[in-house]
Amino acid sequence: RNLPGHGTTVEDCNATKYTEWLSFVEENLAELSAECDELYVVGLSMGGVLALYLASLFPINKLIVGATVLNFKEAFKVNYIVPLVNRFIVKQKKVKKFTKNKHKRYSGYDYYPLMALNEFRKLNNYTIKRLKLIKCPTLYIHSKADQLSVSSNVDLVLNNISSEVK
């Protein structure tokens, strides 16, 4: 099963609230925890943000996150412009920033779903407030060549979680 609003259309993505994403991952981890003795949660990008949220809520044994996008490279646009315009301009054409070969492996939408991006911003703000609740051993992976996530996210996470092993 896909995360609500994902893997279908920009319109589906735009129609989804961040609370639906939280409910989905909570329900799935609760099901998994009934079958497992230990829980290791791994997430990349938005999945990393959702993994952080889960680790703030559930007794996770180990957490691995990569390229979390709690703060965006285009922070001003995401934090101030998108909340103002997302109801009027619901999608924006993507500018291809990847090389030809890298783009062939990319399977996302051709447009940024701006209403969903605004929900992602809300998810990030909510998750940042919960970082102190994370106590499990945590590995954070971030590439210096990352084109989407800023490296300051590493410090944001590692300086705010309560884990002794990071």
Regions of interest found by a model, annotated:
Residues 1-10:
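Conserved alpha/beta-hydrolase
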Residues 9-35:
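Catalytic nucleophile-loop/oxyanion-hole region of alpha/beta-hydrolase
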Residues 133-134, 140-142, 146:
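Short beta-strand/loop motif that positions the catalytic acidic residue
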Residues 64-74:
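Active-site nucleophile loop of the alpha/beta-hydrolase fold
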Residues 43-47, 51:
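Gly/Ala-rich beta-loop-alpha elbow adjacent to hydrolase catalytic centers
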Residues 113-130, 136:
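Active-site nucleophile elbow and catalytic-triad environment of alpha/beta-hydrolase enzymes
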Residues 136, 150-159:
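Short alpha-helix in the alpha/beta-hydrolase fold that links the catalytic acid
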